[in-house]
Amino acid sequence: MSLTRLLIKDFRNIENADLALSPGFNFLVGANGSGKTSVLEAIYTLGHGRAFRSLQPGRVIRHEQEAFVLHGRLQSEERETSIGLTKDKQGDSKVRIDGTDGHKIAELAHLMPMQLITPEGFTLLNGGPKYRRAFLDWGCFHNEAGFFTAWSNLKRLLKQRNAALRQVSRYEQLRPWDKELIPLAEQISTWRAEYSSAIAQDMADTCQQFLPEFSLTFSFQRGWEKETDYADVLERSFERDRMLTYTAHGPHKADFRIRADGAPVEDTLSRGQLKLLMCALRLAQGEFLTRESGRRCLYLIDDFASELDDARRGLLASRLKATQSQVFVSAISAEHVIDMSDENSKMFTVEKGKITD
């Protein structure tokens, strides 16, 4: 599925934009601060309900406006789908699909699977475990129909359990929460483990092409001891959890560890190599989705040229073209992306929030 039309109103520095898009490569060229990243962020927000540079809605709404409006048309082989998102300064959202309101943001995420590659995306590799959990959970969300509901219920129960830890004196008082929490935790951990195992070879093959000088390994850590029943862990950890006032073990503490030649990648790779690894992981994940479900990702790449030499840019471009997916690329200069262009590409110039093609 590709995004054939994008309408943006009062988002960042963009007052109004109506873009007819290519199903292949779309290039956004402009100086720093021109608004080219804002276009990528508008697409991301349309599919996620939130921006990738700010979690506060007021910061992405254009100055002195009350809300932003995003609208898109998605085209698949079978049909066209109309989608829309409005969000005000209080964070209240309205999702519209095919002309009807009342839809959930998760429905937009399902319709628009996308991979984001930005200069800030290094957190996948050198940030905390939550970023790598999010990487796995993206795959589980798009591969397991029940994942989102289970994950949402897990978050709710953990919040309730942590609140209860401040009030209880005996473990038996927590059993009502743990009775619901334990099967959810085990199911989510099983899905994550299965997904990480299924995609491991895809990641290894892609990483070998991008970083042949390293031997990369991947390991899933579920968030509590191996070969240990989660129910036993919760009961055994009760006094410590009560003292900390939060649940110290569980799927919310899981990690997906990535090593190069046996050492953590953040201690071994240069910034350029980290960017290559990030690109390889995002590509592998998108290609795995296509192979398993027949659905293609949208790829959003901000500041394409940074950290990469000509050869590596060429490799990334050729791999992206091979996916036959829709790709959005921002760059300061057209010279950085002209080699990627073909007869099906579109080049947009962005200047002070105005977009022309």
UniProtKB/Swiss-Prot annotation:
Record bears the keyword Repeat: no
Pfam family, one: SMC_N
Gene Ontology BP annotations: DNA replication; DNA synthesis involved in DNA repair; double-strand break repair; SOS response
Keywords: ATP-binding, Cytoplasm, DNA damage, DNA repair, DNA replication, DNA-binding, Nucleotide-binding, SOS response
Major location category of this protein: cytoplasm
Gene3D superfamilies assigned to the protein according to its UniProt record, in alphabetical order: P-loop containing nucleotide triphosphate hydrolases, RecF/RecN/SMC, N-terminal domain
Gene Ontology MF annotations: ATP binding; single-stranded DNA binding
PROSITE patterns, per database record: RECF_1, RECF_2
GO cellular component, one term: cytoplasm
Location within or outside the cell: Cytoplasm
NCBIfam families hit by this protein: recf
Protein family: Belongs to the RecF family.
Biological role: The RecF protein is involved in DNA metabolism; it is required for DNA replication and normal SOS inducibility. RecF binds preferentially to single-stranded, linear DNA. It also seems to bind ATP.
Protein's UniProt name: DNA replication and repair protein RecF
Source organism: Salmonella typhimurium (strain LT2 / SGSC1412 / ATCC 700720)
Classification lineage: Bacteria, Pseudomonadati, Pseudomonadota, Gammaproteobacteria, Enterobacterales
